[in-house]
Amino acid sequence: VQKGRKAMLQETWATVTYGLYDNRKIRRLKKFPPALVENRMLFETNDDFTDNGRALFDYLIEKGYNKKYEIVWLVHEPSKYKEYQFENVKFVQNFKKGSTIRRAEAYKYALTSKYIFYTQAFNWIGMSRRNQLFIDLWHGCGYKANKNGRKVFFDYCLVPGDIFIKTKMEFFGCTSKKLLSFGYPRYDMMLKGSERADEYKKKLLKETDSEKLILWMPTYRHASSERLNEETLNNEFNIPIIDDADKLLELNKFCKENHILI
């Protein structure tokens, strides 16, 4: 009950302060936007500091691009990321505490950044500035329809390869010129590998008498968090293909016989 009351008070306070301060400031920022900062990059990911945005950020830091560019992250709680505050790197609170209401400061950085990188959609800004570049790093490339027909705004969007261009043209309703088949930064990170990952893989294969490791990350799945649910699956295990225990045992038998670990 106390948690519920606290959340309700936070939401109420966020709404009040938005009406008194943020809303007016946002309107003014949009009407009289400050000058673009030519060397400012802005990052936002669906879950803070993750996905393709995080992988690209790590690469930029590794190569020293933060010496030339200011890199700003929009996150829920900036204090969580103190260890990543390298030279010219800043973490800015995106939402008012305990709410889904964006702060005026988030708009300020969105309206003044020359380059904006994101992984979902950035429609909330409601406008784009001349000479701003909106680059959608996106978060996956499954063959699924754009069910709600929403428009995702960008100047360019990454896809893993040429084979995805046609399907993403249909999904986003854009031309092929806007789709860059450079691959995803997180794929580069995964393929680069690490010594720890190699050691763990060897350990798993040895323990299970396996020769091959398959990492299965189904898009259509049921999750404990409603926000992460992609589809409602009506089967025993809430994952695709494996509808019941018999199919699971059949797959397990096949894997054992062929020394495969999933």
Regions found by a protein language model. Name each.
Residues 1-38:
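Membrane-proximal basic amphipathic "stem/tether" segments
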Residues 37-193:
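Active-site and donor-binding regions of nucleotide-sugar-utilizing enzymes
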Residues 14, 19-22, 185-194:
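Generic detector of solvent-exposed, compositionally biased contiguous segments
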Residues 20-24, 64, 258:
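Short, flexible helical or helix-coil boundary motifs
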Residues 51-59, 188-262:
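Conserved catalytic-core segment of nucleotide-activated headgroup transferases in glycan assembly
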Residues 2-4, 150-154, 218, 236-237:
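Short intrinsically disordered, low-complexity coil segments enriched in acidic
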Residues 22-32, 121-122, 198-203:
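A short, compositionally biased domain-edge/stem linker segment
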